[in-house]
């Protein structure tokens, strides 16, 4: 945490020291991008970094300004940002985005902003944002009031991956008052977003009404809340480590890895307490969907406790979990869509692209005749070496192919006769093998 800032020299040296410490792991990066709104936080960050680069060997400093076009006052901000960058000798990238309103305009604008950042930041490059200690305290309070768990109460991480690079928040230990002191000491000008005065937004209400009241009674409230967020981040790190240990056995052993779908074995998970099961699943689902809140875990219990021949489903954002035998599988919405009809394959030496269903390659000597890819409709039979003609449904049961995958499993027909099933070499007539690269997540 920065000590009290008394004059220009001490302010500069304190902020320099903090930035050098926080950004040391990325000194070899090709570029540091500052997310430059023109507001106080990003103005101080950009100024401090450019002045620091005059005395230290740093990556090239660039700035990016995202213009949402949501309010008339904001139309002047790109020009302001350009003037500041011209004065500092910094290249500025101005990106104009269209915000699609949804349930939350704030969230839609933030999503559009970070999509623009991700597109701009190159491989191994850094995006630096100016959120400070008061922002962290505000975020913790906001999430606490929404009933967040440990991950949510960890508030904003100081580092996370973003696109091809990383996002770093180097000012989370600095208060807004300290940033204002620095800005005034250096004669900096910044813009004020008029929407920050509108108390109908929950964050503004916390910032303007709640936090000042708390700080009247407890002057170090923001510092204490930010410290709690840091402790929650540490606790979440431990929970993540525990989840990785608990998932290690559950993620092994699938007979159908060629499906390119995440799956878990149920037996290792059943050995865990309910709390550890939920922790492991939160960690596993984090990269796939929005984690369910504490009131929506009944879907998991249905999957876990169903009979082996049942096919329960747990619907989540962007897909669903399905059970097949003693495993649960994540199926994104694309997997749940229906596949098309038959596809002719005039030249089996060329990889065949299946509409919405991956691709096929034929290895070995292809059957002679008209080749066509079809999908199950029921009642299929095929000749199996040494076993005569067998019902396809029974053959797929023997191969332990999950029920949800069977409607997508490509079937190779030659002159109207089923001769091969994708990725199941035991179900292939002749000397060919049908290799299917299934669509992934």
List where the protein language model places each region.
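Core alpha/beta nucleotide-donor-binding catalytic domains of modification enzymes
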Residues: 2, 6-213, 217, 241
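AMP-forming adenylation/ATP pyrophosphatase catalytic core
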Residues: 2-11, 15-40, 68, 97-99, ...
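Non-catalytic, surface-exposed connector residues within folded enzymatic/regulatory domains
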Residues: 75, 103, 200, 204, ...
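Short amphipathic alpha-helical segments with heptad-repeat character
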Residues: 211, 215, 219-222, 226-229, ...
């Amino acid at each position: 945490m920065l000590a009290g800032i008394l004059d220009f020299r001490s302010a500069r040296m304190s902020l320099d020291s903090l930035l050098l410490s926080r950004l040391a792991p990325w000194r070899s990066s090709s570029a540091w991008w500052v997310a430059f709104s023109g507001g106080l936080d990003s103005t101080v960050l950009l100024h401090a970094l450019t002045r620091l680069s005059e005395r230290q060997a740093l990556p090239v400093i660039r700035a990016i300004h995202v213009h949402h076009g949501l309010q008339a006052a904001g139309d002047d901000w790109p020009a302001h940002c350009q003037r500041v960058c011209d004065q500092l000798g910094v290249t500025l990238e101005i990106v104009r985005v269209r915000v699609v309103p949804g349930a939350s305009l704030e969230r839609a604008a933030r999503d559009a902003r970070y999509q623009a950042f991700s597109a701009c930041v190159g491989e191994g490059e850094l995006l630096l944002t100016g959120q400070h200690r008061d922002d962290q305290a505000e975020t913790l309070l906001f999430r606490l009031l929404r009933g967040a768990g440990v991950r949510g109460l960890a508030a904003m991480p100081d580092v996370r991956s973003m696109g091809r690079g990383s996002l770093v928040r180097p000012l989370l230990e600095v208060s807004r008052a300290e940033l204002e002191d620095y800005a005034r000491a250096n004669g900096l000008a910044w813009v004020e977003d008029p929407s920050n005065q509108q108390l109908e937004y929950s964050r503004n209400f916390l910032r303007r009404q709640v936090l000042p009241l708390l700080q009247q009674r407890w002057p170090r409230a923001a510092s204490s809340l930010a410290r709690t967020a840091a402790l929650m981040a540490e606790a979440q790190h431990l929970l993540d480590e525990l989840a990785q240990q608990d998932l290690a056995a559950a993620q092994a052993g699938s007979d159908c890895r060629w499906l390119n779908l995440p799956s878990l074995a149920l037996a290792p998970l059943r050995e865990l307490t309910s709390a550890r099961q939920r922790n492991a699943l939160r960690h596993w689902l984090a990269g796939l969907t929005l984690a369910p809140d504490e009131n929506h875990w009944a879907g998991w219990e249905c999957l876990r406790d169903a009979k082996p021949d049942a096919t329960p489903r747990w619907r989540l954002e962007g897909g669903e979990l399905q059970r097949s035998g003693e495993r649960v599988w994540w199926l994104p919405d694309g997997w749940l869509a229906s596949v098309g009809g038959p596809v002719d394959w005039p030249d089996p030496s060329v990889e065949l692209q299946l509409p919405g269903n991956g691709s096929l390659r034929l290895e070995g000597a292809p059957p002679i005749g008209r080749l066509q890819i079809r999908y199950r409709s029921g009642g299929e039979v095929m000749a199996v070496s040494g076993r005569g003609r067998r019902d396809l449904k029974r053959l797929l049961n023997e191969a332990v192919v999950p029920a949800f995958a069977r409607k997508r499993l490509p079937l190779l027909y030659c002159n109207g006769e089923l001769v091969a099933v994708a990725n199941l070499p035991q179900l292939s007539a002749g000397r060919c093998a049908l290799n299917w690269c299934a669509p992934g997540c």
